[in-house]
């Protein structure tokens, strides 16, 4: 049964789905399985073990050179976009330093569109349950900004990284007003972000190799450059209880630490080559954990020495992308390549897995933990879904994102247990209000 809620999206009523299990499909405003340039460049290189060959045609040599500068050509073979999608991906690659001459970009886009077209996406699967939610969405002010990550600030505002517009955005849910803050370095590619207790917003400049701090009161941005030229693309960042910021460097294959008091930045390489450190979270003991999107591994980082301990996941094709930690210090990750939700017990190394409702091509992505409940997105279903998993009952419940989502890359929760999503491909943000479930905040 399909019901509608009373919320509005751009002046229109948007649906909330409840009732019996059903499959639903619908057009997306923009269908981009778009990644930050280094994500396209590095993340999926392990999916195909065979050495692929590109078709002979104009653009082949440039594609081969540009893609091989960061990743296996299997990435291109496994990818698929329409012309608009490849246009966005190629521009992101160039922003991140891929060697594609400006005069050859049109040829490269035409080549990729011709030989690696968009692939059919799996239909979203709606699983009913007892929890009720409503979903409200907003378009961000700058077209084509592609919000990548959201963050919830102590004053109740919601922030997002406008990655392709070179802005940080602030949204006030009380007034429905947006304000965007331009960054001083062009094409910084803001990616991850988080607020501090003083109201500053810290972010990673994925295209320009620095971590930034925005003072919303003045608009001033302080930049902390990476100390190693290989650390070209800082990705996800977190605060630890000791006050330091820890972060991943995806294509640079590193993780690092920034001391906000001194400005000192240190980076170390991942033990596994091309492991592409991606999502990161911190446990109750103050130990950062991160997932390796280029390998089948989860890793912990000693906050003092920066030594790394890796945990090998049982399936060789696993590619964990984002991570969340529940109060029992269980490590939960979205297995993007296989369509699974995974749980790692770091004390024993035991791994448990559950197939995501949307199937092996659903591409689970952004994830957060609200107390012991897991919430995540399926980024490749049509439309995208919000998924809730109860570890005690091992049951899923899912909801469709009315706009389609257009690849929900990350999500955060509020102290009340509601969710904010960054809907990259449809250029928006979304609020998921959880109406009738226990909503206890987990650690940030």
Cite the ranges covered by each PLM segment.
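Beta-rich, blade/repeat-based domains predominating
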Residues: 143-155, 186-198, 229-242, 272-288, ...
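Short loop/turn segments that connect beta-strands within beta-propeller blades
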Residues: 172-176, 215-219, 259-263, 302-306, ...
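Conserved beta-strand positions in repeat-built beta-propeller and related beta-rich domains
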Residues: 158-164, 201-207, 245-251, 288-294, ...
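C-terminal capping alpha-helices of c-type cytochrome domains
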Residues: 96-124, 199, 417-419
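Blade-level signature of beta-propeller repeat domains, shared across WD40, Kelch, NHL, RCC1
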Residues: 406-444
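A short helix->beta-strand "capping" segment at the edge of beta-propeller domains
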Residues: 126-144
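The canonical Cys-X-X-Cys-His
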Residues: 64-74, 108, 112
């Amino acid at each position: 049964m399909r019901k509608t809620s009373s919320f509005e999206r751009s002046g229109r009523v948007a649906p909330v789905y409840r009732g019996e299990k059903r499959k639903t499909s619908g057009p997306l405003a923009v269908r981009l399985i778009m990644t930050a340039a280094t994500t396209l460049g590095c993340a999926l290189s392990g999916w195909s073990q065979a050495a692929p060959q590109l078709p002979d045609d104009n653009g082949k040599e440039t594609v081969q050179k540009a893609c091989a500068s960061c990743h296996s050509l299997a990435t291109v073979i496994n990818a698929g976009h329409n012309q608009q999608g490849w246009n966005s991906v190629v521009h992101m690659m160039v922003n991140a330093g891929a060697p594609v001459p400006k005069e050859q970009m049109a040829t490269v886009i035409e080549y990729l569109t011709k030989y690696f077209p968009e692939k059919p996406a799996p239909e979203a699967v709606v699983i009913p349950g007892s929890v009720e939610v409503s979903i409200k969405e907003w378009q961000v002010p700058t077209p084509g900004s592609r919000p990548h990550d959201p963050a919830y600030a102590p004053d109740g505002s919601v922030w997002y990284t406008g990655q392709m517009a070179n802005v940080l955005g602030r949204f006030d849910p009380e007034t429905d007003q947006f304000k965007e803050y331009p960054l001083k370095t062009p094409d910084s590619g803001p990616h991850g972000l988080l607020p501090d207790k003083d109201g500053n917003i810290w972010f990673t400049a994925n295209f320009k190799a620095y971590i930034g701090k925005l003072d919303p009161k003045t608009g001033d941005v302080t930049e902390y450059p990476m100390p190693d030229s290989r650390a070209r693309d800082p990705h996800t960042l977190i605060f630890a209880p000791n006050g330091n910021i820890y972060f991943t460097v995806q294509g640079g294959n590193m993780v690092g630490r920034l001391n906000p008091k001194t400005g000192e930045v240190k980076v170390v390489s991942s033990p596994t080559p091309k492991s592409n450190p991606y999502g990161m979270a911190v446990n109750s003991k103050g130990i950062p954990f991160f997932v390796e999107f280029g390998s089948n591994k989860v890793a912990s980082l000693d906050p003092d020495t920066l030594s790394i301990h890796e945990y090998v996941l049982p399936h060789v094709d696993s590619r964990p992308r984002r991570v969340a930690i529940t109060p029992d210090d269980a490590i939960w990750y979205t297995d993007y390549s296989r369509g699974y939700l995974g749980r790692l017990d770091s004390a024993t190394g035991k791994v448990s897995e559950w197939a995501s409702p949307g199937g092996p091509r659903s591409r689970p992505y952004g994830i957060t933990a609200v107390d012991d409940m897991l919430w995540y997105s399926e980024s490749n279903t049509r439309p995208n879904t919000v998924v809730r998993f109860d570890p005690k009952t091992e049951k899923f419940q899912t909801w469709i994102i009315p706009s389609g989502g257009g690849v929900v890359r990350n999500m955060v929760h509020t102290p009340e247990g509601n969710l904010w999503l960054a809907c990259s491909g449809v250029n928006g943000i979304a609020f998921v209000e959880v109406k009738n479930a226990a909503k206890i905040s987990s650690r940030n």
